[in-house]
């Protein structure tokens, strides 16, 4: 199940980030702490009462010189588009302002649950002064103090009551779920539109069960069925926040959550940026199958070595994605786009691959015969046996006499031998070393 999304919106200086940080940092256990995105706290995975969810601090979307109203609109549009539950924050110290009314009116157009949190209610006496906020027309309100952590438990209890039922989630029914991610302007939308063009049969647009995203199902001439996740979001135009880097990262994280295979799009003209590596790292850490797509290849002056040189650059910059195949395409001319569905299917097959224990142990023992296990202070690592315990990604447990004797380099050696013996192109594999009891 994809984690529900909670967005925090409100006019400036009402304490949105304080509430966000308090909820994410103290009152809620952070499930995973990723560098970069959680550093600026735009998007934080979190948990409350055994519900896992993701929080968006829309205040992280900054539009620079854009007028105030446009910045507020960007926040609210982001919340309405992406969230399952919206928390509007106002300030109990200042009372209802015209800007609060602007935000509330924008939220009227959504049928998603909106919860009003009146912040800066730092003592019980202040509760008597907050009833004017009912005039915003958002129903029940929750007095809280972000700076003191007061009232957040009640607020979160109300939030999780609105989360969708796991039972309502769509079944994948054998279709391969994949997403196309990348920085703004690398050509994601062009690739999406080309792949959903006349040579594809659109079976249906599936309404997302936990948000308004549209997942597009299509079949190839070979009869393979795919679900391209959140194509509605990729194809939107004219949103004021569409080209902000933080929004791009946030959308990529959501796509990773909802997909089995990730197509990471790079721009051949612009080259590789830090954000490319940042987002790719999230997909790798999540254990998703990966394909690297280099778009705008038609715009590059080439000789007989250009493609190989660019591939070497990718391998150098994305050392952790050495398993990901690279495809050079042009959404403008259609070059090689017809090959993408088959490659997605191949890496998805590898992502789901199971290896019998007997075959796996033959490979492990052959590897040890070629390169004996390491020793430390006269003690030699002994590998007893290995077995596969999971797929998506393929995960193997290796039982040894002492975990401390398994050096990283030898673990990497065994992983490489497993990859040589079995085709795991496109998928990370996990090795877990355990001491045999």
From Swiss-Prot:
Cited SUPFAM superfamilies: P-loop containing nucleoside triphosphate hydrolases
PROSITE patterns linked to this entry: G_ENGA
A GO biological process held by the record: ribosome biogenesis
EngA-type G domain span: 4-167, 176-352
InterPro entries according to UniProt: G_ENGA (IPR031166), GTP-bd (IPR006073), GTPase_Der (IPR016484), KH_dom-like (IPR032859), KH_dom-like_a/b (IPR015946), P-loop_NTPase (IPR027417), Small_GTP-bd (IPR005225)
Annotated residues for binding of GTP 2: 182-189, 230-234, 295-298
Domain KH-like: 353-437
Keywords: GTP-binding, Nucleotide-binding, Repeat, Ribosome biogenesis
Keyword S-adenosyl-L-methionine carried by entry: no
Listed GO MF terms: GTP binding; ribosome binding
Residues where GTP 1 binds: 10-17, 57-61, 119-122
Oligomeric form and interacting partners: Associates with the 50S ribosomal subunit.
Family note: Belongs to the TRAFAC class TrmE-Era-EngA-EngB-Septin-like GTPase superfamily. EngA (Der) GTPase family.
Role summary: GTPase that plays an essential role in the late steps of ribosome biogenesis.
HAMAP family: GTPase_Der
Protein name in the entry: GTPase Der
Biological classification of the source: Bacteria, Bacillati, Bacillota, Bacilli, Lactobacillales
């Amino acid at each position: 199940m994809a984690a529900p999304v909670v967005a925090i919106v409100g006019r400036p200086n009402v304490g949105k980030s304080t509430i966000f940080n308090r909820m994410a940092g103290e009152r809620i256990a952070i499930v995973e702490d990723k560098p970069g995105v959680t550093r600026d706290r735009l998007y934080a995975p979190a948990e409350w009462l055994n519900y896992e969810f993701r929080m968006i601090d829309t205040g992280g979307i900054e539009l620079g010189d854009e007028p105030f109203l446009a910045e507020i609109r960007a926040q609210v549009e982001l919340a309405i588009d992406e969230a399952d539950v919206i928390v509007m924050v106002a300030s109990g110290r200042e009372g209802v302002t015209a800007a609060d009314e602007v935000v509330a009116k924008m939220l009227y157009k959504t049928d998603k649950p909106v919860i009003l949190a009146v912040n800066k209610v730092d003592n019980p006496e202040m509760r008597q002064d907050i009833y004017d906020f009912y005039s915003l027309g958002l129903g029940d309100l929750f007095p809280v103090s972000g700076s003191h952590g007061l009232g957040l438990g009640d607020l979160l209890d109300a939030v999780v009551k609105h989360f969708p039922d796991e039972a309502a989630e769509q079944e994948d029914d054998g279709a391969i779920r994949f997403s196309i991610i990348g920085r703004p302007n690398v050509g994601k939308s062009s690739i999406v539109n080309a792949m959903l063009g006349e040579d594809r049969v659109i079976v249906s647009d599936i309404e997302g069960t936990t948000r308004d995203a549209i997942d597009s199902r299509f079949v190839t001439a070979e009869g393979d069925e795919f679900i391209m996740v959140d194509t509605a979001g990729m194809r939107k135009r004219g949103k004021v926040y569409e080209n902000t880097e933080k929004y791009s990262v946030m959308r990529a994280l959501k796509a990773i959550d909802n997909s089995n295979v990730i197509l990471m799009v790079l721009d051949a003209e612009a080259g590789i940026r830090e954000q490319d590596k940042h987002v790719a790292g999230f997909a790798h850490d999540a254990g998703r199958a990966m394909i690297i797509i280099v778009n705008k290849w038609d715009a590059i002056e080439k000789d007989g070595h250009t493609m190989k040189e660019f591939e070497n650059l990718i391998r150098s910059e994305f050392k952790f994605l050495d398993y990901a195949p690279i495809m050079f395409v042009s959404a403008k001319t259609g070059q090689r786009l017809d090959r993408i569905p088959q490659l997605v299917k191949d890496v998805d097959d590898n992502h789901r691959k199971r290896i019998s224990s007997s075959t796996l142990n033959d490979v492990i023992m052959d590897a040890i015969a070629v390169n004996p296990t390491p020793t430390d202070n006269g003690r030699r690592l002994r590998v007893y046996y290995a077995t596969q315990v999971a797929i998506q990604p393929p995960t193997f447990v290796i039982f040894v006499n002492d975990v401390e004797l398994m050096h990283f380099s030898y673990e990497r050696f065994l992983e490489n031998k497993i990859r040589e013996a079995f085709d795991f192109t496109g998928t990370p594999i996990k090795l877990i070393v355990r001491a045999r009891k």
